[in-house]
Amino acid sequence: MEFLYSDEENYLKDRFFDFFNMNVDKDKYTSIGICGGRSIVNFLSVFLKQNFSFRRSHFFLVDERCVPLNDENSNYNLLNKNFFSKMVDKNLISISKFHAFVYSEIDEATAIHDYNIEFNSRFNIFDFIIVSVGEDGHIASLFPSRKLLFSDVEGYQYEYNSPKFPSKRISLTPKSLFGSKAVVLLFMGVDKKCALENFLASNSSINECPARLLKEHPNLLVLTNIKRDESYAGS
């Protein structure tokens, strides 16, 4: 694990961009997993700034809320409005490379099956994943003390009882998250301080802090603007 702290956000974004370039060859067919949220949009903006062209990369959501694509709670909607549409306008990516999960209340099983097939027909694993960590330590839609946190299958599954609204979501499973080739974890904002300390602590469990699922990943970059407590300075 490489751990980087800075109160200079641009420095962290530059380190993210460097790590991305070390792990993703834009001339090769690659899969990139992203979650929603303001921190993710902020870090992705470095690609706009750099006029980075995604010729062969495909983006998939690591989690999504079971809402219409135009709903204000949709991760796809947030990311499309604030990042992908701008990349399309600059001719840096085709919108077809951003794969949405289309939820169907009438046929939930087919909806998630189709999204799994959409990924599996193109890739075996994710080449690169960037996820932000929630206040409770959750990543994607893997929340503390939820059954999905301990799933041993690959791909996407439903979370029917999320502690955050809306309660019904899909999420990439722990096995698929850990199986990715490279991972970036973001702990951004003082409200994530407890989550960061639980992530670093030796006596904390995955059940308390799901982000710990990725702590032993062989190619993990952790970025934070949260000043660490002295007790964790040597972690």
UniProtKB/Swiss-Prot annotation:
EC number, UniProt record: 3.1.1.31
TM ranges: none
Family: Belongs to the glucosamine/galactosamine-6-phosphate isomerase family. 6-phosphogluconolactonase subfamily.
Enzyme category, top tier: hydrolase
SUPFAM superfamilies the UniProt entry points to: NagB/RpiA/CoA transferase-like
Top-rank taxon, per record: Bacteria
Alphabetical UniProt keywords: Hydrolase
Gene Ontology terms describing biological process: carbohydrate metabolic process; pentose-phosphate shunt
Record pathway: Carbohydrate degradation; pentose phosphate pathway; D-ribulose 5-phosphate from D-glucose 6-phosphate (oxidative stage): step 2/3
The protein's name: 6-phosphogluconolactonase
Cross-referenced InterPro entries: 6-phosphogluconolactonase_DevB, Glc/Gal-6P_isomerase, NagB/RpiA_transferase-like, PGLS
Hydrolase keyword on record: yes
Summary of the function given for this chain in its UniProt record: Hydrolysis of 6-phosphogluconolactone to 6-phosphogluconate.
Pfam families attached to this UniProt entry: Glucosamine_iso
Catalytic activity entry: 6-phospho-D-glucono-1,5-lactone + H2O = 6-phospho-D-gluconate + H(+)
One GO molecular-function entry: 6-phosphogluconolactonase activity
